[in-house]
Amino acid sequence: MDNTTNINTNERSSNTDFSSAPNIKGLNSHTQLQFDADSRVFVSDVMAKNSKQLLYAHIYNYLIKNNYWNSAAKFLSEADLPLSRINGSASGGKTSLNASLKQGLMDIASKGDIVSEDGLLPSKMLMDANDTFLLEWWEIFQSLFNGDLESGYQQDHNPLRERIIPILPANSKSNMPSHFSNLPPNVIPPTQNSFPVSEESFRPNGDGSNFNLNDPTNRNVSERFLSRTSGVYDKQNSANFAPDTAINSDIAGQQYATINLHKHFNDLQSPAQPQQSSQQQIQQPQHQPQHQPQQQQQQQQQQQQQQQQQQQQQQQQQQQQQQHQQQQQTPYPIVNPQMVPHIPSENSHSTGLMPSVPPTNQQFNAQTQSSMFSDQQRFFQYQLHHQNQGQAPSFQQSQSGRFDDMNAMKMFFQQQALQQNSLQQNLGNQNYQSNTRNNTAEETTPTNDNNANGNSLLQEHIRARFNKMKTIPQQMKNQSTVANPVVSDITSQQQYMHMMMQRMAANQQLQNSAFPPDTNRIAPANNTMPLQPGNMGSPVIENPGMRQTNPSGQNPMINMQPLYQNVSSAMHAFAPQQQFHLPQHYKTNTSVPQNDSTSVFPLPNNNNNNNNNNNNNNNNNSNNSNNNNNNNNNNNNSNNTPTVSQPSSKCTSSSSTTPNITTTIQPKRKQRVGKTKTKESRKVAAAQKVMKSKKLEQNGDSAATNFINVTPKDSGGKGTVKVQNSNSQQQLNGSFSMDTETFDIFNIGDFSPDLMDS
């Protein structure tokens, strides 16, 4: 290509192979268009301004080399080709492109420098080769334009044009792999879901010359997809991988059902004779040797089918007879069918396939089975009997509800049987038949099964516990006394808790008796007295002046309304800063009439203290009552909570119905007081009380007998008593009023809103 005069003289060859050396031929003999060979202007990639001009230069060079003269002339007139010229060279002289470039003789030219308008310019390419990038792309464009897709190069060396062939052929049950041979008939093999492949489009990888049909690895490929010319084909051995089995699907279904029956239902096995007959049914027909004709094979298969049908009919007849006998001997279900769980297979979770249910004649063939309960057997036979008649749903095994321990299921059936026996016997059903097992027939027979021995022991244990539970009500009836306190009903429990809350509020000692004891009271010997409703007798009152005739009635705790309505109000009794005042009939042994208007709090019945007054000692002396007051004052000095003391009988008149209440409010801090001071304070308090009572008796004011003595403690420990007599009055409407200057009931403590509402 050093010669510029011979660059564009090669001709287009029949193939796409280009040689590096051009063909030297005359231009006038080829085309009417002439090159301006004497012109110094030519097309070259050396002086290209940009990539577009570089592309145009190569396209022009391609058109000239392949003798596309008209296209080259049109492209030269329209496209912006990079034109060059050589300066300083003789016209028509042989110059080298590389030498001219090195010497700086080349220059950029324009289309105005072209002398001949009809002639083509020569091309002088610095990078001109047959394997250039642009040349290869132009070859591809040419092949796409002409539609030359079936060339030998594309067919032999392009792997992308080969079709994708499936591994397994479509609809070939005879060539099913060995690991899919035991599938039930309702399971679709994976080959039936594959897309169909036609014979024309099937083409094996490669040319197929090394394809051996006798190889066991190639047995999945159907022989109709392979031509007889390609591969080594042995016609005699074709029966090895494609046997002619007309009843392959039926035998596979029977085989799978019977295998699952003996594999997963060990507890439901039948005797030896039906098992042998079913094992004969499992055996596949043995294929005769290949030299025997096909007619003999078909005859043998027909004979085997007839034998199998006869065996099935015999088994069905035997089973029907056995079921009829069982129906006459034992009635149909005693166990509730809804309470019996489904029994899943033991190994169904490992295979991942739901086992199919075998026919009914293969499940139960015996009347009695050693490893199965009679209740369970009767239930399954009942379900299968109604299933055949279309009355019951089919028996399905759940994979999730699997029993890991068969003893749990056996214990469930035994408990159901015992419950049914006890219910029927207690109801006096004359037509009832026991569903317990015959111990003499089952337990006396020696068995090597550990489960059978364990079941008999378990049944004995359950029966013993059941008999023991029967004797408990009889023992309860025979007992005359109860050692522990018995709460009869829920209301008495609430009342008992209400009584305990009252004691906690009064800071009194909690005992098992009904109410807190009075002073000098001896606790009864039997502290565990039951809190039960009943007639408890009239109370015994210590003070004869306050004694009333109380008729016997029901326990007052039954109709008592609870004092605390919610949790928050109940907690007020336990607050340390609380100074809680209780009504008198909760603290003393006296009885308050129900119609008394001076009581602020809700009143129980008159028999509120019957339980305590039965054991009290009646002391009517005034000295004993004074001693009681002194003891209560000692308790007030030691405790910071308010207490209530009952005055002596001399301080009240016989006509008064409400005793006097002396409330002592003490500071939180404990102070030590000498014995002499306490004695003096007691004497002063007693003298003042006696004087008050005498004045009231002289005046004859019965309404002013209701007074409250508030005795606060000062810093010196001396008790000062404020008597509120004149200001307290009995109102006309029956309410009790007090002077707010000396006694403010709302400032005593944090009263609960429930108490105020009541």
Curated annotation (Swiss-Prot):
Which residues belong to any copy of the LisH domain?
A: 51-83
* InterPro entries from the UniProt entry: LisH
Localization, per the record, is: Cytoplasm; Nucleus
Q: Where is this region: Disordered?
A: 1-23, 191-220, 268-299, 322-355, 428-454, 587-681
What keyword terms does UniProt attach to this protein? Activator, Cytoplasm, Nucleus, Transcription, Transcription regulation
Q: Where is the composition biased (Polar residues)?
A: 207-220, 345-355, 436-454, 587-600
Q: Which GO terms describe its cellular component?
A: cytoplasm; nucleus
Q: Does the keyword Transcription regulation apply?
A: yes
Q: In its keyword annotation, does this UniProt entry include Transferase?
A: no
**Disulfide partners:** none
Q: Name one Pfam family in it.
A: LisH
- UniProt biased composition (Low complexity): 269-299, 605-664
Q: Which GO terms of type biological process are on file?
A: positive regulation of flocculation; positive regulation of invasive growth in response to glucose limitation; positive regulation of pseudohyphal growth; positive regulation of starch catabolic process; positive regulation of transcription by RNA polymerase II
The UniProt family comment states:
Belongs to the MSS11 family.
- Quaternary structure (record): Interacts with FLO8, STE12 and TEC1.
The name this protein carries in UniProt is: Transcription activator MSS11
